[in-house]
Amino acid sequence: MTQSNATHSAVEESTVAERLSAASDVHAGYIGLDVHKASISVSIAEAGRQAPEFHGEIPNEPKAIDKLVRQLSQRFDGQPLLFSYEAGPCGYGVYHQVQATGHDCEVVAPALIPRKAGDRVKTDRRDAQMLARLSRSGELTPVWVPTPEQEAVRDLTRAREDMKAIELKARQRLGAFLLRHGKVYAGKSKWTQAHFRWLETVRFETPVQQVVLEEYVDAVKAAQHRVAGLEAQMRAVLPSWSLAPVVEALMAMRGISLIAGMTVLAELGDISRFDSPRQLMAYLGLVPSEHSSGGSRRQGGITKTGNGHVRRVLVEAAWSYRFPARKTRAIQQRAEKTSPTIQAIAWEAQKRLCGRYRRLADTGKVTQQVTTAVARELAGFLWAIACEAMGKPHGSRATA
């Protein structure tokens, strides 16, 4: 097993052996679900070593799922059951519905499901049987499932991210159109009020091209309006969010704005649930990949497993550490809303990360490698601040 997979597996709240021991004492049956948009294939593994039984296929509808749970409850005399299915585009509706019936359900990480190298046959039936069998043996790794509140905030931050991507694409198209026709802006900064005033003065020889310009400009403005609206909604939602105090604590860090802080916690939830900062780094795919055998040890690029949204946010935040460490007015205003201990951790982090960025850059490292290394350590400091905000031990040496 590679180091990345081993470390990633350790992120879970219990080991495979612990889950196996607990499952064997609690659950009478293990139900594998291969969930698709319109259907769910169902397999059942009873306690023991018997081969899983294929139960059949049901529609992916609430009524059909309720009927299935009732039938299985009667079959096992009301004893607890464990349902398992892979994380995917169908979300967590099945999870919440099964949990509401009093049975257990786990959504498992597809990338961490053990698979035989020579197995080349894949069907819904075989997948359901595999999930039931591996669930019984305790070899599945469950993912963290957000609460409905958490999922709503995550949908909001992802919508803002999608609209921002549309805005950037609209800007690129407008810029390419202008460059293609020799219309170059002489000002310092684009997409400012001055830049948009200049766009109003641009004229083309043909009316058709003038219409094209107006459409491109309108597309940029419309995208900006959507982004601004979603960001306003994020600010409005924050005070009532259960993780609002943690967001404010993370904002004491350089490079972590309200948008970045909400994105991190919307995607990961309470990051203080990780036992150590190394587990969080591995979960985000910010640790080096490794292929070691015998006496040789070879490390490669980062694993890029886990949540890519948070990884992107942290890498972007890491760029701010290329400048010397200092307490700017904006950072100080955000930090003053937090405790002295959190302020001390944030300042210690800034001094260390700015110095690390400078040292790595001086060695000739590629800029992307430098920012990734800084992002990895930044994740560790965010974990310490989250633990402090939640009243959990973190072992940071920074003191007020």
Residue spans of the language-model regions?
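A detector of single, family-specific signature residues
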Residues: 1-400
